C-alpha cells in the first residue's frame, strides 16, 4: 500500500497545486486542449481502422486539429507570460491590453488556419 501511495503522492500534489493556483480561464483553455487531443486521436484512430479514402478530408481535419492545438498552446503561453509580467512589475499600460492582443492574435490565426483547411477540402 505504501508503494502505491508513494507513486500517487507527487501526482496528487501536482493536481492540488494546479487546482489551487490556476485561474478559471487557463483551466478552460486546458480543457479545450484536452478536447483537441481527443478529437485528433479519434480522427487518427478512424483513419487507422476504416481508412483514409477521402484523403483530403482526413488531412484537412487532422491538420486543422493539430494546428489549432499549436495556436491554443501559444495563446496559453502568452496569457501565462502576461500574468507573470503584470505581477512582477507595474508599468504604464499600453494602448491595447496584452490580453486583448493575445486574444486577437489567437482569433486571427485560427481564422487563417480554418480558411486554409476548408480551402484544402476542395
From Swiss-Prot:
What keywords does the record list, in alphabetical order? Endoplasmic reticulum, Membrane, Transmembrane, Transmembrane helix
Query: Superkingdom of the source?
Result: Eukaryota
Q: Which InterPro entries match?
A: DAD/Ost2
- Membrane-spanning residues: 31-51, 55-75, 102-122
Any Pfam family matching the protein: DAD
Question: Where does it localize?
Answer: Endoplasmic reticulum membrane
Pull the Cytoplasmic topological domain ranges from the record: 1-30, 76-101
Describe its assembly: Component of the oligosaccharyltransferase (OST) complex.
Q: Which family does it belong to?
A: Belongs to the DAD/OST2 family.
Which PANTHER family did the record assign?
A: DOLICHYL-DIPHOSPHOOLIGOSACCHARIDE--PROTEIN GLYCOSYLTRANSFERASE SUBUNIT DAD1 (PTHR10705:SF0)
Task: Summarize the protein's role.
Answer: Subunit of the oligosaccharyl transferase (OST) complex that catalyzes the initial transfer of a defined glycan (Glc(3)Man(9)GlcNAc(2) in eukaryotes) from the lipid carrier dolichol-pyrophosphate to an asparagine residue within an Asn-X-Ser/Thr consensus motif in nascent polypeptide chains, the first step in protein N-glycosylation. N-glycosylation occurs cotranslationally and the complex associates with the Sec61 complex at the channel-forming translocon complex that mediates protein translocation across the endoplasmic reticulum (ER). All subunits are required for a maximal enzyme activity.
What is this protein's name? Answer: Probable dolichyl-diphosphooligosaccharide--protein glycosyltransferase subunit ost2
Q: What is the lineage of its organism?
A: Eukaryota, Fungi, Dikarya, Ascomycota, Taphrinomycotina
